[in-house]
Regions:
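Short, charged, surface-exposed secondary-structure boundary motifs
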Residues: 60-63, 81-85
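Hinge/cleft segment of the Venus flytrap/periplasmic-binding protein
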Residues: 83-142
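Venus flytrap/periplasmic-binding-protein-like
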Residues: 26-30, 34-69
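Short, well-structured alpha-helical segments in soluble
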Residues: 5-21
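Short beta-strand elements at the ligand-binding edges of bilobed clamshell
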Residues: 66-78
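Hinge/beta->alpha junction and helix N-cap segments in small-molecule ligand-binding domains
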Residues: 1-10, 26-32, 55-58, 75-80
């Protein structure tokens, strides 16, 4: 389960095993990054260890500004939705959709259209998440 409390337990166990001898935590999403950061806070390591997540959750953006989370992966939802709608219409009209890659699902190569994602840091937060209207600046910078 991608729950913050589970991530905190896993991070606590990892810290107990590694001590302070590690550089980064690559979390599956921003919620689990938040759980891992709670473990880091308990050990006095928050802001000293690189922590990544994905989804650009509001809390993650606030942690990025605060210095406890290094980055998040942002997927521009408006662009994704527009592209998905365009492809759905094409498929409904039996028009071709050009795959830009393929994904091996273990049984076959599935044609895939990959969409560019953005690594969001303190330096580009305003130009990405805020500029797209995903989160308002006053909610992030409080």
């Amino acid at each position: 389960d991608w729950k913050p409390e589970n991530a905190k337990k896993v991070a606590n166990a990892g810290i107990n095993k590694a001590g302070h001898n590690f550089d980064a935590i690559l979390a599956s999403n921003d919620g689990t990054a938040g759980g891992a950061i709670q473990a880091l806070i308990e050990e006095g390591l928050a802001g000293k260890v690189l922590v990544t997540g994905q989804d650009a959750d509001l809390a993650a953006c606030q942690r990025i500004v605060g210095g406890t989370q290094s980055m998040t992966i942002y997927k521009p939802l408006k662009k994704l939705a527009e592209q998905a709608a365009e492809y759905a219409v094409k498929l409904a009209q039996r028009r071709p959709v050009i795959a830009t890659g393929a994904y091996d699902n273990g049984q076959t190569q599935v044609p895939t259209v990959q969409v560019e994602v953005v690594a969001v840091t303190k330096e580009n937060l305003k130009d990405t998440v805020v500029a797209d209207g995903f989160h308002p600046a006053d909610a992030i910078y409080r």
